Amino acid sequence: MGLAHETKKKSIRDNYFLKAFFLGLGLSFLVFLPFIVVDGGRFLFYGDFNVQQVPFYRLAHDAVRSGNLGWSHLTDLGANFIGSYSFYLLGSPFFWLTIPFPSEWVQFLMGPLLILKFACATLTGYVYIHRYTKSKDTALIGAVLYAFSGFSIYNIFFNHFHEAIVFFPLLLAALDEYMATRRRGLFALAVCACCVVNYYFFVGQVTFTLIYFFLRLICKSWRINLKDFLLLALEAVLGLGLSCVLLVPSVMTVLQNYRTSEYINGWNAVLYNNVQRYLHILTCFFFPPDLPARPNFTPDSGSKWASLGAWLPLFGMTGVIGWLQMRRKHWLKKMLWISFLMALVPFLNASFQMMNSAYYARWYYMLTLMMARATVLALENDRVNWRRSITWCLVITTAISLVIGFMPTFETVDGAETVSYGLEDYPTRFWSYVAIALVSLAAVVYLFCFCRKHKKLFYRSTLVALSLISVFYSIFFIALGKTQSEYTWDHLIPYSLNGSKDVDLPGLQESRSDFYESLDNAGMFWGIPTIQAFHSVVPGSIMEFYDSIGVPRDVGSRATADHYGIRGLLSVHWLFDDDHDDSYFAGKDMSDPAIPGFAYYGNASGFDIWENLYYIPLGFSYDYYITRSEYNALSEGSENAIGDRELALLRALVVEDDRAQYYDGILQHLPEDQRAFNEENYLQDCLDRAERCCSSFEYTNTGFSAQIDSNRKQVVFFSVPYEDGWSAQVNGEPVAIERVNVGFMAVTVPEGEGVTIEFTYRTPGLTLGFGITLVSLALLVAYLMLMHRLPQKAPPRRGPSLLRVGKFSQYAKSRHTSFRRPGALTLHVTREAAVPSEEDSPPPKETPRQSSQSESEKGE
């Protein structure tokens, strides 16, 4: 019994998969714990993490728990919930871990989930790397290098990027397993998982995996026959099909975004138009990552949110350079050179994101996995010249540091010439990064000088040093990030994360609110509809609307107070102005509101509250209409100036030219003498529209419903974005939905009191995607059953290198050897004397062990 217990304990202790997971868990716990304690149990960072990741998680969590999976009225002016949030979190298993917990707990789960992600990335990194290492300890080192690389730490800012970091090694591991053992099904499941967790990153993973696969075939690292190749392709297709339940709705949503059609071309596809970007790419391999939105080494590289981070803690590029300098031919060397080339050529870099023109390096986690693998292989290879690789790394690091740190800049200010030294924006931060890189190199030198002779000691010491550097530089990075935003206890924690508990206003959920110069996505924190949003994936009709009135809409809806017209059109009732900042909605004396029609109401939860006295409830009708071409002829406006188009939207319904005849019998064409637009007329238009609005309006889990008293047949407008998934009923009868006012919806209602209007939303592509998923699942099961029944041939294996036939010169080159004379290699066998006959041979001598054994036998 004791022996069995001891064996079990030993097997658990020797389980390096568990070691990898718990090592990653422990290191990430040390990284995040100080910040979780400081923020009262929450992990808060800065920028996108605070204003996107945190509110998105809570919004989606509440939507799933309430069953509101169709239309999200809390996202911008309204959005397809599945299409908008599949990019961020819907496919993430980490998000679904929050569902059993109450809504108030979500903010406290962000830190533990990040810790879990780092632990899982360490585990999956080990799963991939351990196949290729001689020692499990070096595989563990490689796993930590991957999980805590500069890319991973940089993208704490983008919390949802870590799902791709976690799952990508499983894709390569499944492919490796197929090629080594022909094990069926794993690759299909890995493809499905990678596509489900994030379709954007999946595009880059497909590109990288194709290069990985065909390069290894070309280099003869793998062999595959036609049958197995076709079966592998079938698994890839089935895996893609399995993911269609999320993929199809997501693609249908993303295709509405104009940013997806901006392809790289011309000289921009050949060379980066900003020369600093080349240096930024180089520095990301030799130094810890810059903060997102705060590039320091190259301030004007145009790469603020590009995810340029690929530094391997402790080792940097030493192991990679050492591996690349070996003369041995290996597919990994070619893979690394190809990857570095693709990073430097714009159109090759863009191939990881469907050739989009926007610059991002969000595929570098795949490159860091290859770099981590090369580093640990170099550690195990005695022929690697570490002295030379460390020297190269030191020279490059020092050169970059000296050039950026001391380069003089001459300027003439008020007639006097001044000189400044250093190209960086933040010298203290810059020299801190330099110090971390140089201390890491010094630690590597120490390890090789004093620990290299004893392998076990060397690997353990390396792992300890790697862990210390990883924890230290990660804490330093997060601490720097937190200095870029205001103290979280000033406003974010007490007022935003409290969920508007102290705000009690009439109609807050049935109208939209406006947050003046406030935190992005402030309405999401409170769970109320707003006209502001910081969200990349929204209906194309929203972008079309804002574009038509001159308001930029790329990743956020942030119409300034100059655009007062849309406040009436979009049914804004309440405006919130931070009472702790220097941006005053009505001036310091609160006597001159920036938007006409607003009056001070009171103060609550850190905000001055203003009420729109000319508020128009959602759902109202018009007397007049104008065509789209007439609308386009009006002045557009700009980012900080209102145009006639915006004001015309409250005077007349804008209809498409080909539908004008339909509206002639219901509405009047706007007369020429009523086409003067100004602030005074705007307020009167608001009063006119409010007189003919719905008596009630309510959001539902399937859309929204309203009721109106109609004195005649009329068109009722709703400022809800138009999408193909909408259907409508009036008094229980289906009616057609009209696309009006450049991207919004309207229905025709009959005369009568208490006319009910019901809008229902069904996610476009969800049914089709679900059907494809079911069919793919059935085909995968049938495929696996068929493969199980058929006799399987063992995959071809390459024999030992000594038995391979190859060129004599190649052998000499790969082994770093030279021969005194050319010619074939001849094996000289040591000659032995002829075996004597049994008669002449003396009896064999008895060994002490045999004699003692015979004596014991005799004793028995």
Predicted segments — roles?
Residues 222-230, 319-343:
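Membrane-interface helix-loop-helix junctions at transmembrane boundaries of multi-pass membrane enzymes
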Residues 51, 55-62, 93, 228-232, ...:
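Periplasmic/ER-lumenal interhelical loops and adjacent helix-loop junctions
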Residues 24-28, 118-131, 137-218, 231-251, ...:
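Membrane-embedded helix bundles of polyisoprenyl
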Residues 6-10, 53-56, 660, 665-807, ...:
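Active-site-proximal, structured, solvent-exposed surfaces of multi-pass membrane proteins
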Residues 100, 426, 432, 458-714, ...:
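Soluble catalytic regions of membrane-associated enzymes that act on cell-envelope
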Residues 34-132, 137-169, 193, 197, ...:
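Active-site lumenal/periplasmic loops and adjacent helix-entry segments of GT-C-fold
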Residues 1-36, 231, 457-465, 778-843, ...:
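Start-transfer (signal-anchor) and selected internal transmembrane alpha helices
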Residues 182, 201, 331-497, 751-809:
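Contiguous transmembrane helix-bundle modules in multi-pass membrane proteins
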